[in-house]
Amino acid sequence: MKIVPLVERPELVDQVAAWGFAEWGHLNPGQTLHSRTARIRETMDADRVPIVLVALDDAGLLVGTASLLFDDLEGDTRNPWLASVFVPAGQRGKGTASALVVAVEDAARRLGYPILYLFTTSAARLYGRLGWRALERRDYRGEHIQVMDKAL
């Protein structure tokens, strides 16, 4: 597996946007698939936030994605955020999500951020195994979320 910035594989933007919209679109009222795709395409970068990373298998096929973002949790002033970690069901259990998380942590560290935040509806155990600390639970747009952080 190889992890690269999405800016190096722009042909994958549509799939990354579709995964994100299908998984978390309900948490972003007013956002459409088109607007999500356009936002990703317009802000792709490898050296400043936002950074979208993609995981590729040995054949070069897309098997996951994760992002480093500002302002991922509306109303929360902490930054930056590990966000949009997604691996399709058929690719799970191979360490892809963990590798993506570590790659985003490395990107944040490289950019000089001392701490990283995330929120999750269902993967707190995964993040806990990777050294993330639970900060708070709250309701967010109809979902129960866990906010976590990790010192880099």
Locations of regions flagged by a protein language model:
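A short beta-loop-alpha structural element at the N-terminal edge
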Residues: 1-16
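Active-site rim helix/loop that mediates acceptor-substrate recognition in acyltransferases
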Residues: 25-56, 67
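Short hydrophobic/aromatic beta-strand or adjacent loop that forms the aromatic wall/cage
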Residues: 50, 143-147
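Conserved beta-strand in the GNAT
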Residues: 52-54, 61-71, 79-81, 86
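Conserved hydrophobic beta-strand within the GNAT/NAT acetyltransferase core sheet
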Residues: 85, 116-118
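Conserved acetyl-CoA pyrophosphate-binding loop and the N-cap/start of the following alpha-helix
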Residues: 91-103
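Conserved active-site alpha-helix within GNAT-family acetyltransferase domains
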Residues: 110, 114, 121-144
